Amino acid sequence: MQKNSLPSLPPAISVIIPVYRGGDDFQECLNALAASNSKPKEIIIVADGGMHGTPQPDESLGAILLETAKAGGPARARNLGAEKASGDILFFFDADVTIGPDTIAKVTAEFAKSSKLAALFGSYDDAPGKRNFLSQYRNLLHHYVHQIGKEDASTFWSGCGAIRREVFFEFGGFDATLFDKPAIEDIELGYRIKKAGHKIKLCKDIQIKHLKHWGPWSIVKTDFFQRALPWTELILRDKNFLNDLNTDTASRLSVVAIFLLVLSLAAAILWPPALAVSAAAGLLLTILNRNVYQFFRKKRGGWFTLRVIPWHWLYYFYSGLAFGIGYLKFSFFYDEK
């Protein structure tokens, strides 16, 4: 008579949150974590540069608090938290988000379903925490990009992402030497994990709320210096031009179209017929991005969508500019060592 095998235990979750001057948003993050229906094995908070400007976690949360004397960036902070963790799954999320009551349960269930799943990540929800236009636009765009992305993902996102502990340490964690400030340390780690043949899943139903307030400068600074420039160098280093998320074919063509638009408008000052090229480029941009504009119209209405378009086109312009600068920098200064 064959004995019934005992059901396997669900993987233990270690929550790891890096925080730098977290303020009120971090308090909301902690409140949401305390309200979770499923409790993780442990909660590890890494205060990058100390607790100045960061609320003290309530003792009832039972969190392990690590502090660094000097800020070294989120990559190093997450690595420190991972070294302290003892769970099977390292669940990273940012200090300016709130998880849902069932978020931890969903993460646990995904890893319990497949032993071959190395990592997963989710997305922001469609109800950003801050009500100003740019915060709504920026966070809704992020939500849209992840919601149309491929579930069989080629990268990783630490804003709401989980990795098996053994996989994380197999690859040495986040590259804190290359990324000592907020950048694309999560994307770079995802590239390494995927290149080795591991499975990463984009779980579109695992959604968190982003509380960050976005303004004009914070958007351009983040997109240009912390994402587009280092991402360009990463793409060129790995020779990895993916057709997914922010680097899909429509986005690449949109970059070409926006530069065609700008150059033809400049040429029209001396040669007015160039305006026909400008009109064609504008039409092409609209057609290429019709789905995202339909998404914004459905979520926030026509007037909101009209205000989105110039910001979205500006995004393509400075992303293309960053690619050009990154290409030159890589060509002349990159050291393969």
What would you call each of these model-derived segments?
Residues 31-40:
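Short, acidic, metal-binding catalytic loop of nucleotide-sugar glycosyltransferases
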Residues 68-85, 106, 157-158:
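Glycine-rich, basic loop-to-helix element that forms the pyrophosphate-binding segment
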Residues 90:
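Short aromatic/hydrophobic "clamp" motif used to bind/position activated sugar donors
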Residues 102-134, 211:
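Conserved donor NDP-sugar-binding/catalytic core segment of glycosyltransferases
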Residues 175, 180-243:
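Catalytic donor/gating beta->alpha subdomain of glycosyltransferases that bind UDP-sugars
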Residues 212, 217-274, 297-306, 336-337:
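Basic/Trp-rich segment in TM-proximal cytosolic loops or flexible interdomain/linker regions
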